[in-house]
Amino acid sequence: MASSEAEWVTIANNLLFKCHIHLRIHKLQDCDANVFIALYQSILGEKVPDLIVIPRSQEDNAHNVQAVIDSLALDYLQVSLSHITGENIVKGDKGSIKNLLEIFDGLLEYLTEHISESSHNRSASEQFCRDSRGEEPVEELESAKESSWRKVPFMRCSFSPDALGPTWDEEEAESTGEIIRLGDTAHTFSLRSNGAQNSMNFWSRKASTSGIRPPEEMLNPGLSSFLFKNGPTCEEEEAPPIHMATSARKLGEPIRAAIPLHPPYHPPEPRAPCPIGKEYLCSGHYLSTPASGEHRAPSVEPGDVFLTSTLCKDDDQETDLDLTESSKTRRLSKGERSENRAVAPSEYPPFPQKARKRLTEQELHAMSEKLSQRLSELDWMLKTALGDRATGEAHGKDGGAGDEEAHSANEEMLSQHSDSVMEYGPRKPRPGFSMHRKAPYRSHSLSPSSVNKHRQSEKERKKQHKSKGTDTHHFQAKALTEAFERELRKNKVQENVGLRGIREEEEETEKSYKEAFAKGTTKQSQVQKIYSRKTAAPTPKGGLLKSSKASPMKVNEHSLLSLMLEQFPFLYVSDPTLTKMWKQQMAQVEQLRREAQRENRSKKKLQDEIEEALRRHDLLTALVKKEYDHNKRLQDFKDRIHKQRLTQSKIKENRHQSVRARKYYDDYRVQLRAKMMKMRTREEMIFKKLFEEGLQIQKQRLRDLRNYAKEKRSEEKRQHQNELDSMENYYKDQFSLLAEAISQGRQELKARQRSQAQTLHKVKRELRAKMEKEIEQLQHLITQSDDDAFFRELEAERFKARLQLASFQYSKNPFPRGQTP
């Protein structure tokens, strides 16, 4: 799918355009609740359950989107969509919007293909009903059925008015992954349309040079019917315009009836047909390139095998002519069938329910007939391939043994004259299988006579009116698989036998070489013996010498002589002998190489034939598996319809039961109420009188209890008062004792305070005396400082300090004796 936001916007706009919704978005966040509700109602044709028509808030929009998601998950897809929520959609979460757009895109794609298939199947069943009443020959009916059945998986058309029923979801995929894989339309339409133009040009060129019809005849009903009636070639008649081929329109055609238009109805404008339908058929499913020297019969379905036969023998040429005629008849009937399919959706009204059931059974019968015919054709092609291989083996092994020639001749006879692949080996008959084994064509037989053709046509007519179940298809698939396995085992055994013979011849040659060398060796001389003893490798103690026979030797085709010289280094061989032996070895190598090349050529041819048989077996297995899956899907569809009907009947029965139970309950309730209203009996009066007496007794009892409680309360009150008085006396005594103790404490405290005051006064007096003494000393010092003697003493001390400094600085200078500094 698309990765960028612009591509997702394009996908959303394409969805809105296809569903005729007049909305366009410019960014991914524009996909709100209204867009998804409109897509739901347009694609599915139903209203959203539990829808709030006029949303007044963001919660209402989230509720509407969640209703759309829940309806898709529960009613249609039947898978969990818990990763997508309505709240995220309303908030503009890009991941949730992309997931929901992808689901709607895949759902629209799947519905388109489903409705196209149902319309084609309905037209095929209509044609079958008309043909069974004798309106057309039987051979034309068979080819027309085959062509319509083969084109169903590839053709698409617009919706028909009765195509979308209430039970469409019973044939849908089982998971979101399958629904998503059905989509990818917006991204792949451009790729399909680009590759389609080239294929149309190719077919137009091929129609002018060969007799093969282009696929426009299969898509063009008018031209096909004209060719069937008058028989001109493709070059004589010109194709009508493309718009006549209504079945070729795919998703480009607007969806009309399945999508209700809630606004006022506007008739859709005629739109140019989308080139996807026809060109996609031409490019993907009808194109076959012819090889030089070969003739290929074109087929419609890619699962069919192209019939190829070389123009080298007379009987092969006759077979090619028969194949060409049959392919032309088949193509003409296919063209007529496409006309009937294109007209069917507009001619016939919707069928009632019983008619639809009958048509489903007729479709199953027609499909079983077509499957048996295709299996017989593939059986004939396998016989042709195996017969050619047996003939090639018989011509390629001229120099082989006689038993091989007899085996190849016997195999060729079996491949030419047997009726099926199952006659190559012993087998047990299977029930219900032998009547379908003969093929309508033979490749290696002589030209068929008119009697054989008449018998063959009678058998085909009988087979057309006989119903076959799915068990027959299982038996046929198993039988063909066993035949292929038996043939492959036979080829592998033959290949292994040939390889074993080559190995035995090589071993015998090596043995002869060894014997010749053993006989031709001379005795060793004394010198050689001494040399060999000296050059012999010393063995470890306790060990043994290894013999040359202990390990197997590997000898290549070029290394025999060199290996012998390495094994016998002490042996003397002359140069001429060595040269001669080398030449013999080279000649032997050349001879072995030529034989190996011849063997490789035959082996390669056999391998190519085996690969071709395997390829055809794979194609056949894929075809049978496809038919089995298709029948299984049809059976599952019928089972789902049956289960849905059973479920609906059970729901209806449960509703009836609930209604009956409700009605019975209402009747019982009314009767019981009437009965209770009428009950005025003696028992009721006795009960009432007893109740009144009980009330009087209860009242008297309550009075007695009240008096007794009053007496008790007065007695308790007296006791309580006495207790209070005693407690009051006790606490008075305690308080008096406490007052005495407090008074004694006060007196002691006062005495202590008086003693403390006296001590404090004494300390104050001592401090005052001390301070007065110190002040007097200070005053005396101050008076001394005012004297001159004090200052002189200070100056003498200062001068003395200076003299000490001067004696320290000038102590080195010489002074005359008798002088002091």
Swiss-Prot record:
Coiled coil stretches, renumbered: 578-627, 695-789
Ranges of compositional bias, category Basic residues: 427-441
Keywords (A to Z) from UniProt: Coiled coil, Cytoplasm, Cytoskeleton, Phosphoprotein
Residues that bear Phosphoserine: 445, 447, 449
Principal location class: cytoplasm
GO CC terms in record: centrosome; cytoplasm; spindle pole
Compositionally biased spans, kind Basic and acidic residues: 325-340, 390-410
Pfam family, one: DUF5745
Subcellular location per the Swiss-Prot or TrEMBL entry: Cytoplasm, Cytoskeleton, Microtubule organizing center, Centrosome; Cytoplasm, Cytoskeleton, Spindle pole
Chain positions covered by the region annotation Disordered: 310-354, 390-474, 514-550
Protein name listed in UniProt: Centrosomal protein of 95 kDa
Lineage of origin: Eukaryota, Metazoa, Chordata, Craniata, Vertebrata
Gene, per the UniProt record: Cep95
